[in-house]
């Protein structure tokens, strides 16, 4: 399905990009948080360039929103393509696998510690930078790691107080950075996936188009029955014109404006919210 190209790169993101680049020399490990539903679309190519000489850990957050088979595929993909030293699936929301993340950080930083000890330095600090796109769950992850609400947490993309150093424990410090995207997406699909999952503010998006793209993907993946059951649709409602399906969702679920016209926008938001909250099944969008 074609649509207007999606792009969102406000001025503060350029400043954050410069901040990340400038501080990279202070860092031992780069922990990049990606969305398990769109691991490739949510991986910032700029970070790959900046962190090429650093130890890299990719964290697949929101892993409870996709099937285990997809997680295994992407863990293997990132390792085989030399995109990370370690890859771990977590859920910052539930706390799943947070303890395992500590172990991975210790494992990845062990080489530096051994080198420093060989030089006679007993006290060795490991510095970790946490990066990721907006609304990927970085702040919640940091709260889980630190064990308290030291990082501001928002449920809208773009919420963060700026660069923050956080001491996790003796010998381990963490640099939190605001979520950023990149100036030009590699394809229309990358922008669409970011929009569907909430990495770009809904207010600036053609929300009906985004919802139609999601519906189209679900039909392509063989998930029509989920849509049918969730929104009281009939087999006859299935159409190659996806906008007509959105209209049927509004009709079957009695979504009307004050003038008794179909509220297509309400239907569009409903479909997107349901996907983001895993009410349409566990599946990713990077295929």
Predicted features and spans:
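Helix-rich effector regions associated with P-loop NTPase G domains
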Residues: 1-29, 37-38, 43-45, 50-56, ...
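Conserved active-site beta-strand-loop modules that form the wall/rim of enzyme catalytic pockets
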Residues: 92, 142, 172-175
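Short, structured loop/turn "capping" segments at alpha-beta junctions
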Residues: 112-116, 143, 149-155, 221-226
């Amino acid at each position: 399905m074609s649509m207007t190209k999606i792009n969102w790169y406000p001025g503060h993101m350029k400043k954050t990009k410069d901040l990340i680049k400038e501080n990279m020399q202070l860092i031992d490990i780069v922990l990049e948080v990606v969305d398990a539903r769109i691991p490739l679309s949510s991986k910032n190519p700029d970070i790959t360039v900046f962190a090429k000489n650093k130890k890299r850990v990719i964290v697949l957050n929101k892993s409870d929103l996709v099937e285990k088979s997809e997680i295994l595929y992407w863990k293997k993909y990132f390792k085989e393509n030399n995109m990370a030293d370690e890859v771990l699936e977590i859920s910052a929301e539930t706390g799943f696998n947070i303890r395992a993340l500590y172990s991975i950080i210790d494992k990845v930083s062990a080489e530096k510690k051994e080198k420093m000890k060989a030089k006679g330095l007993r006290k060795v600090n490991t510095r970790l930078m946490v990066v990721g796109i907006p609304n990927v769950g970085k702040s919640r992850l940091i709260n889980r790691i630190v064990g308290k609400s030291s990082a501001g947490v928002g449920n809208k993309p773009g919420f963060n107080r700026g660069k923050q150093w956080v001491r996790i424990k003796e010998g381990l410090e963490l640099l939190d950075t605001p979520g950023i995207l990149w100036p030009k997406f590699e394809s229309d699909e990358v922008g669409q996936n970011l929009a569907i999952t909430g990495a770009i503010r809904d207010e600036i998006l053609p929300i009906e188009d985004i919802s139609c793209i999601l519906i189209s993907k679900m039909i392509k993946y063989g998930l029509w029955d989920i849509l049918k059951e969730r929104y009281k649709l009939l087999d006859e409602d299935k159409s190659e014109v996806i906008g007509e399906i959105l209209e049927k969702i509004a009709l079957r679920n009695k979504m009307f404006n004050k003038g008794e016209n179909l509220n297509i926008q309400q239907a569009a938001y409903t479909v997107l919210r349901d996907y983001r909250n895993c009410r349409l099944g566990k599946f990713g969008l990077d295929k």
